[in-house]
Swiss-Prot record:
The keyword Ribonucleoprotein does not apply. Residues 26-36, 100-114 have a biased composition (Polar residues). This is Coiled-coil domain-containing protein 140. Residues 134-163 form a coiled coil. Residues 1-79, 100-163 are annotated as: Disordered. Keywords: Coiled coil. Residues 115-131 have a biased composition (Low complexity). Residues 54-63, 146-163 have a biased composition (Basic residues). Residues 135-145 have a biased composition (Basic and acidic residues). It comes from Homo sapiens (Human).
Length: 163
């Protein structure tokens, strides 16, 4: 059997640049991200050549649109095609940001919807009871009972006095 690897580019001396290396690092990174690497080769070449997943791209777009452009893209000149692509990406990212915000601030399903047109504009949300509010409620009940007892006693005295 001969050499396992018959590719002349891979047999070049170590340390010398391969024949396809003729650009700066930014262009090289852009070229690598555009080329698809077969799944079998990914295991041999390592994680740096693996394609980013859709989820990681989406998360990067969300971060970029919600927190402003990344420093790597800010110094880069954008062509008209790039701007169109970026506009679409920003629109979808803004949509996801807005949907996340609306999901987190949506009114609770048990909120009372009033039929009064003046109140309908502002939905009322019920606050969750805390131990402190329970205590306040109990104290209020006790005060009502005390007042009621006093009233009864006074009425009883008045009845007895009249007799």
């Amino acid at each position: 059997m001969g050499d396992e690897c018959s590719n002349p580019d891979l047999l070049a001396e170590p340390g010398s640049s391969p024949p396809w290396d003729h650009g700066n690092q930014r262009q090289e990174a852009a070229n690598e991200s555009n080329t698809r690497v077969p799944r079998v080769l990914k295991a041999h070449l390592g994680p740096e050549t693996a394609q980013p997943t859709k989820r990681s791209k989406r998360n990067r777009w969300r971060r970029q649109s919600c927190q402003g452009p990344s420093p790597a893209r800010s110094g880069q000149f954008l062509g008209s095609a790039d701007l169109g692509l970026q506009r679409g990406v920003l629109k979808s990212a803004a949509r996801t940001c807005l949907s996340e915000i609306s999901n987190s601030t949506r009114a609770s399903p048990e909120s009372a919807q009033s039929t009064d047109p003046g109140r309908a504009a502002r939905p009322r949300t019920r606050t969750l009871p805390t131990p402190h509010s329970f205590k306040i409620g109990e104290e209020a009940e006790e005060m009502k009972k005390k007042k009621e007892r006093k009233r009864r006693k006074e009425r009883k005295k008045e009845r007895n006095f009249k007799k």
